[in-house]
């Protein structure tokens, strides 16, 4: 009897394994052969090769070379539209953002992306979290670690097939990300619980998220880390790129020092009004962003229903759509577009009809460094003041240049291009012309 039961169990197990193997084979064939939704009449590039299972090679090509791929046409499965469509998309509710999910002797100092983040985190943290948290070295380390590990992990997971995602919790990088999340929670939760218990409202992001949640359950630690991620990464990348551009153009630094000194002397200190009168500094930031934006395509949306644009272009439901930012290098809009010209937008301000579009924070269809439309970066005004204040201190207090024969490094990930943390500067202290 026991032998019979054992034989039956073994035979049944073999049948089950055969059944599972057959289903797995069918699923793999389906995943390989299933059609990818394509908009009729539009060219498609970067198709998966015949034996590129799960499109891993295709994903790597996109992650490493998306900007070049856009020059060839439209990338699939994301639909990249011409900037001509930006005005139609910017406020159309059918395109959903929510669904898209430095003395003569120089001393070597690294102008590291993540070291700059370490300087900007307390600044933004003071506004977002208040004095209780922003100066806590543990919070700074948790935020920096979450950013660094989070970016690497996100890029890694984009290459993996989605059916492997349940296994991600065991990936070493994912474990490191969770470690930083746990540390952030250890710091934030006592502050949040105390604030809620005392009913003390405050004008910071803790209260903002509670108000926006309107009683719905949410994870405040995730929310604060996401906000910090969005603000510190973009600010640090902006800082790194503009410092490198200035190091390559020392004559611009001389003119900027003069502008900063004159503005501070006029107003007595580094005020918001003084910053608003630094047109060359504003132009320098906008030009650096034009030449090296963080993203080469923006306005990422997902269509909630079928959409037919004004020229008859039909876009199916649930299509991931972006708008290319290539106008920022259009020679008809920006003469000699490959050249860094810090004075470009100062000169454009003299043209009356372009004057309002020349501010660093202006989001236009011809310069989408901050996006465009109702979802353009809401924190760009705060970030602009933050970066300008830091640059004023840097320009007045330090001299800097690039090491000889140092090539710039970048981190490429699809449409995103960040300055690499390996970039270094030669810097020394100088005596500033006016006290800040």
Swiss-Prot record:
Enzyme class: oxidoreductase
Keyword flag Hydrolase: no
Gene: phqO
GO molecular function: heme binding; iron ion binding; monooxygenase activity; oxidoreductase activity, acting on paired donors, with incorporation or reduction of molecular oxygen
GO biological process, one term: mycotoxin biosynthetic process
Record organism: Penicillium fellutanum
Pathway: Alkaloid biosynthesis
Pfam families in the cross-refs: p450
EC number: 1.-.-.-
Protein name: Cytochrome P450 monooxygenase phqO
Cofactor: heme
Membrane-crossing residue ranges in chain numbering: none
């Amino acid at each position: 009897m026991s032998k019979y039961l054992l034989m039956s169990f073994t035979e049944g197990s073999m049948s089950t394994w055969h059944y599972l193997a057959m289903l797995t084979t069918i699923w793999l064939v389906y995943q390989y052969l299933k059609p990818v939704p394509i908009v009729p009449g539009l060219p498609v590039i970067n198709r998966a090769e015949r034996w590129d299972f799960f499109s891993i090679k295709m994903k790597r090509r996109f992650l490493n070379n998306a900007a070049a791929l856009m020059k060839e046409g439209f990338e699939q499965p994301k639909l990249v539209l011409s900037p001509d469509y930006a005005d139609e998309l910017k406020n159309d509710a059918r395109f959903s953002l929510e669904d898209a999910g430095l003395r003569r002797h120089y001393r070597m100092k690294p102008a590291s992306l993540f070291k700059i983040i370490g300087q900007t985190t307390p600044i933004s943290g003071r506004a977002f979290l208040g004095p209780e948290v922003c100066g806590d070295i543990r919070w700074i380390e948790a935020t920096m670690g979450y950013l660094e590990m989070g970016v690497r992990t996100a890029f890694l997971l984009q290459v993996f097939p989605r059916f492997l995602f349940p296994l991600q919790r065991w990936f070493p990088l994912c474990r490191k990300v969770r470690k930083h999340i746990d540390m952030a929670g250890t710091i934030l939760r006592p502050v949040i619980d105390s604030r809620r218990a005392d009913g003390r409202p405050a004008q910071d992001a803790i209260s903002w998220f509670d108000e926006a949640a309107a009683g719905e359950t949410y994870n405040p630690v995730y929310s604060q880390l996401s906000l910090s991620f969005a603000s510190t990464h973009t600010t640090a990348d902006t800082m790194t790129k503009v410092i490198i551009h200035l190091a390559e153009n020392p004559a611009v630094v001389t003119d900027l020092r003069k502008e900063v000194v004159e503005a501070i002397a006029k107003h007595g200190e580094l005020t918001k009004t003084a910053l608003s009168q630094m047109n060359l500094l504003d132009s320098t930031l906008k030009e650096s962003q034009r030449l090296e934006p963080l993203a080469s395509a923006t306005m990422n949306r997902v269509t909630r229903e079928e959409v037919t644009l004004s020229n008859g272009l039909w876009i199916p439901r649930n299509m991931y759509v972006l708008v290319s930012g290539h106008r920022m290098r259009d020679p008809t809009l920006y003469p000699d577009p490959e050249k860094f010209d810090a004075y470009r937008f100062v000169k454009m301000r003299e043209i009356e009809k372009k004057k309002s579009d020349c501010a660093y924070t202006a989001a236009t269809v011809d310069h989408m460094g901050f996006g465009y439309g109702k979802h353009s970066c809401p924190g760009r005004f705060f970030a602009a003041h933050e970066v300008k204040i830091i640059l004023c201190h840097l320009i007045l207090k330090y001299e800097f240049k690039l090491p000889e024969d140092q090539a710039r490094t970048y981190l490429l990930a699809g449409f995103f291009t960040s300055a690499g943390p390996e970039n270094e500067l030669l810097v020394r202290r100088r005596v500033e012309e006016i006290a800040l």
